[in-house]
């Protein structure tokens, strides 16, 4: 059975903090790394931190928040993964950048 999401859960959806940007997972690279296409037009290799490794499963086409490294901007850390329901809610509320929707359609046609 699917999970039921209520309004209170949706209100707790995490929005980007300073230094974080939206991205879409293009490719799983292995060794807890993913290739993410970000809304700023760059493709980064993002690391999945230890606290997310076994708790949050990330797949190709998922919308994620990444925090680029200051000293190596072509790399980043994944800080959050959004579910499909959360992505739909963000689109309806206008919180999700239009560029993310375009990235989703490029990576997964018909998304």
Swiss-Prot record:
S1-like domain location: 11-83
Keyword terms, alphabetized: Initiation factor, Protein biosynthesis
Pfam families on file: eIF-1a
Protein family according to the UniProt entry: Belongs to the eIF-1A family.
Gene for this chain: eIF1A
Source species, domain of life: Archaea
Presence of keyword Protein biosynthesis: yes
Alphabetical list of HAMAP family matching this protein: aIF_1A
Keyword Protein biosynthesis set for record: yes
Protein name: Translation initiation factor 1A
Function: Seems to be required for maximal rate of protein biosynthesis. Enhances ribosome dissociation into subunits and stabilizes the binding of the initiator Met-tRNA(I) to 40 S ribosomal subunits.
InterPro entries: NA-bd_OB-fold, RNA-binding_domain_S1_IF1, TIF_eIF-1A, TIF_eIF-1A_CS
Cleaved signal peptide residues: none
């Amino acid at each position: 059975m699917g999970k039921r999401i209520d309004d209170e859960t949706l209100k707790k959806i995490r929005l980007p903090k300073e230094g974080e940007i939206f991205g879409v997972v293009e490719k799983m690279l292995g060794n807890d790394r993913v290739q993410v296409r970000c809304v700023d037009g760059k493709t980064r290799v993002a690391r999945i931190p230890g606290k997310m490794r076994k708790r949050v499963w990330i797949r190709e086409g998922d919308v994620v928040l990444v925090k680029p490294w200051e000293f190596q901007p072509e790399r980043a850390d994944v800080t959050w993964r959004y579910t499909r329901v959360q992505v739909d809610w963000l689109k309806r509320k206008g919180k999700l950048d239009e560029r993310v929707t375009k990235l989703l359609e490029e990576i997964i046609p018909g998304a």
